[in-house]
Structures are given as C-alpha cells and as structure tokens.
From Swiss-Prot:
A GO molecular-function annotation: 5-oxoprolinase (ATP-hydrolyzing) activity
HAMAP family in alphabetical order: PxpA (MF_00691)
Domain of life, per lineage: Bacteria
Organism, as annotated: Salmonella newport (strain SL254)
Coiled-coil ranges per UniProt: none
UniProt keyword list: ATP-binding, Hydrolase, Nucleotide-binding
Catalysed reactions, as listed in the record: 5-oxo-L-proline + ATP + 2 H2O = L-glutamate + ADP + phosphate + H(+)
The gene coding this protein: pxpA
Family (UniProt): Belongs to the LamB/PxpA family.
Protein name according to UniProt: 5-oxoprolinase subunit A
Tagged with keyword Transcription regulation: no
Length: 244
C-alpha cells in the first residue's frame, strides 16, 4: 500500500529543511499568505535535493491573518490570483531544473473551495489552464475534488493527521473546539484509521467514510518533526510506503 505524505512549507517555520527529509510532497507558499521569492527559491532547492514532489500553495491575499480570513471574491479574481501564484512558483521550479507536480490551496481558500462550487471551479480552471498535467489536491470528497474531475485533472484526496472532522467529512473550523488534535497518540490513530480503513471519527462520535490519498502534517506544531518521524515509523511497520 502506498500513501503520499505532504507538508506546507515556506511559511516561516525553522523546521522546513528537516521536514523535507520526512515527507514525499511539499506545498510551497507563494507569497499571498506567507513567503516571498527567496523562501520559494530556498524551498524548491531543498525539495529537489531531497527528491520531494513540489507543489504550489496559493492563498487568498491575506498576509495579516496567514490566509485564514474568509473572503468573498469574484471567481475571475480568484482565477487570476491562483494563476499568478502558480506561475510565480513554476518559474522558480523551472529555473532550478525541476518540475512542478501539484497545486494545493491554502487556509480559507482551501476551506471555502471545499464547499463553494464556483470558487472550486475557478481554482480548477486556473490549474488546468496553466498545466493540465498538474495534480489538484483538495479535501477528500469536496467540491474542489469534483471541480478538478470536471476539468479532467488528476486529483488527490487529502486527509489531515492533526485536524478534527465534522460528521459530513469537513474539517472543524479553527474557531471551534476540537479543531486541532494536540494529542500525538490520537493523531496517529486517526491517521491510520483514515489510511487503512477509509474512515474517520468525527468530533460528535460519528464515523464517516473518507478517501485518503495524501496525508497532511503541519510543520508549525511544537512536536511536528517528532510526530512526522513516528508516523513514518508506523507506516513502515504496516508496510505502507510513503511515495508521491
């Protein structure tokens, strides 16, 4: 059994270089919520050095709140902003002799696109128009995945090791209790359930089905590196191969 393990990088975390030795895919911030040209270049070089698949991590224009502010923007604006960010990273990747493999929206753009078909359509169209061979990463079972499929993109359904789930398979908003899982054992058990059994237990105690093709681990947590190592060890023990 294979699973992709991804992390968001280029967001100001000192652990990026070490984290890139543990994951198979990197989602690199493109400047709208965090990062700049220099951090993008640094992350691309580190990813290439470690054989990690490179992806763009576009966001709403929201550096003040790390891309976590809800916004209502015209789909054409979201299309243009997404295309702009993908193109910026794509130029750096190409200049370094690499190939960009995927796109994963960030923060509130990701969450809103999971439920808003028009927003999801704008993102999927931007990805397709830039490069139809790119993989679109989105929340498992979401509108973003469906929009990607309509554009005949390869999609990858994502689950989160350290996030709480609602009964409908969506993530618990960060403003609500249970949004983040701080207990390492609970996060590990949840991840293995999602990957091996295709199910997740919601904060209300209801089990719901989920398709896990890639697992996100956040690099900004206090124990992120230790957890990443434990998760890799748990996968190895169960003959689950981490591969992009």
């Amino acid at each position: 059994m294979n699973i992709d393990l991804n992390a968001d990088v280029g967001e100001g975390c000192a652990s990026d270089s070490e984290l890139l030795t543990l994951v198979s895919s990197a989602n690199i911030a493109c400047g709208f919520h965090a990062g700049d040209a220099q951090t993008m270049l640094t992350c691309v070089r580190e990813a290439l050095k470690n054989g990690v698949a490179i992806g763009a991590h576009p966001s709403f224009p929201d550096r003040d709140n790390f891309g976590r502010t809800a916004m209502v923007l015209p789909p054409e604006t979201v299309y243009a902003q997404t295309l702009y960010q993908i193109g910026a990273l794509g130029a750096i990747v190409q200049a370094q002799g690499g190939v960009m493999r995927h796109v994963k929206p960030h923060g509130m753009l990701y969450n809103q696109a999971a439920k808003d078909p028009r927003l999801a359509q704008a993102i999927a169209k931007a990805v397709h128009d830039y490069d139809p061979s790119l993989i679109l990463v989105g929340l498992a079972g979401s509108e973003l995945i469906r929009a990607g499929e309509r554009h005949r993109l390869v999609t990858r359904q994502e689950v989160f090791a350290d996030r709480g789930y609602q009964a409908d398979g969506s993530l618990v908003p960060r403003t609500q209790p249970g949004a983040l899982i701080h207990d390492e054992e609970q996060a590990l058990a949840q991840t293995l359930d999602m990957v091996q059994a295709g199910r997740v237990k919601s904060v209300t105690g209801v089990w719901t089905t989920v398709t896990a093709q890639t697992v996100c681990i956040h690099g900004d947590g206090e124990y992120a590196l230790a957890f990443a190592r434990r998760l890799r060890a748990a996968f190895n023990a169960r003959n689950i191969h981490v591969i992009a």
